[in-house]
């Protein structure tokens, strides 16, 4: 019984450490790439993605942290 309680306590402590580490990770600033971590832009920013084309051929998707209330238009 003691072993079961000890194991449960260890699992709870490990879970809390992981959550705290996730909350402390650095956010991605304005106009930096967020393709691999779309939910990690700093406060007031959103991760917006675009499909990239080179000479009419799709070359993948790239995402950038941009301001939430700003809309960008192609030139």
Curated annotation (Swiss-Prot):
TM spans (from-to): none
Q: In which tissues is it expressed?
A: Expressed by the venom gland.
UniProt keyword terms in alphabetical order: Disulfide bond, Secreted, Signal, Toxin
Annotated signal peptide: 1-21
Task: Give a yes or no for keyword Signal in this entry.
Answer: yes
Name the residues of the propeptide.
22-25
- Keyword Disulfide bond carried by entry: yes
Top-level taxon? Eukaryota
Q: Which GO terms describe its molecular function?
A: toxin activity
This chain belongs to which protein, by name?
A: U6-lycotoxin-Ls1a
User: What taxonomic lineage is listed for the species of origin?
Assistant: Eukaryota, Metazoa, Ecdysozoa, Arthropoda, Chelicerata
